[in-house]
């Protein structure tokens, strides 16, 4: 097994070297037949080594590249496989297209390096009203009889469910025309499909605006359910000649309360909307407007929702308070009573589980920002039911994550500055090149785990072991970072500082154990522990006693840590893209 692994690694190394040479030879190879394949619909865990094992038996592979996100370095779900000759690549498509790779059917097609070829309308067709069971393979098999297919795909949502439409790109325009003539209006899995030329987004938008400006189809709702088809026809007949008048009904024949009218002339449709909308018919006001497609209605609803959300955010800006570390005995009524002296409360809510158990936090909304500010000043850190409250302005989740990420970055810079200052102090004391790094509580291992163990980052930093002892070579000389042998005086600032350090260390060790059990990542666990330890001790202790409160802080800190990692990788990602 070790030999196979070494062999695969060696082959991949050779491939990467060959891949670097491709850029210089690409112009010389432009006239040769393509031997490059696009492999899509891959599971995120699929690597270059995995693909090499699958494609190398077909023929000599010159290079493989799994495309990854520039920041997170996670797979984008597709890759490029380059063979030494065209015939091997063609065989790979014939034998491996739509075969499962880690549980997902891969989609293989010829790689089109020229974006103009991928985006051109010639040979590209659009198919809609597809049955949910039609997948990429079924679509390919259906249309491949008309000619060589460069690419085909059924559009899917985030869950992998078909959206009911897809695309097929033929090598020849004649193949696309034949497919449109033969399959448009035909039944596929019991559904009549539409097949037509693919239009660019600009062309579709232009056509859509033209259709809106010259609409003839009218939608009417809020119709009395006792209305007959004849009465509905008579209602709209006075506006002009119609192609169709449909009053929608259930399978049982019951009136659904809405219908559609398609006029021959656009002017008649406009007249119907203007004169019939908001008029009363059989005791009910009618809603009459241009008939819209489902996608258009969804877009409008989305815009309305966003506008309402932004308006709500602006309305509650600076007056909505977030309160945490609440005792389980505090309910909505008691929470309102606690904050009532500071102003007019419009709402007070303690968040609970499905079983009605308090989650330990809640929200109080005042009528003015001044009242909210006063409540923060008076109630923050105040003991209520034996617990110190944390009171602050409520923030959106994305804002909290951004602020936490900034805090992490600032904390790391401070630690780096502390390390530099310690190095300078050590040099001034006659120890050039040597210094005692500060204790990094944020990267403290659990008991029994060596500090310089598997984490290479901390080992390289030379961080101090958790007992604060310096390296062995200094033990016979001055010891920095630990109290003198005589110990601290029982009273005074030094004793208080020593006690706080011990308390922080104990809390850090306990937090690290819990966090490491969830992340199984030493670096992540250390950083998250350090973030939580930045809170005052009186806020950290309740986290160890309340699992739900701990889980809430852990999720927020984890999200902030991930955001920070992405920000740190940003410059590398940009350089990689430019390269």
From Swiss-Prot:
Stretches assigned to the PABC domain: 487-566
Chain segments annotated as transmembrane: none
Pfam families: MLLE (PF00658), RRM_1 (PF00076)
Localisation: Cytoplasm; Nucleus
Keyword Lyase set for record: no
Low complexity bias: start-end ranges: 566-579
GO MF term set: molecular condensate scaffold activity; poly(A) binding; promoter-specific chromatin binding; ribonuclease inhibitor activity
Protein name, UniProt field: Polyadenylate-binding protein, cytoplasmic and nuclear
Organism: Candida glabrata (strain ATCC 2001 / BCRC 20586 / JCM 3761 / NBRC 0622 / NRRL Y-65 / CBS 138)
Gene (name only): PAB1
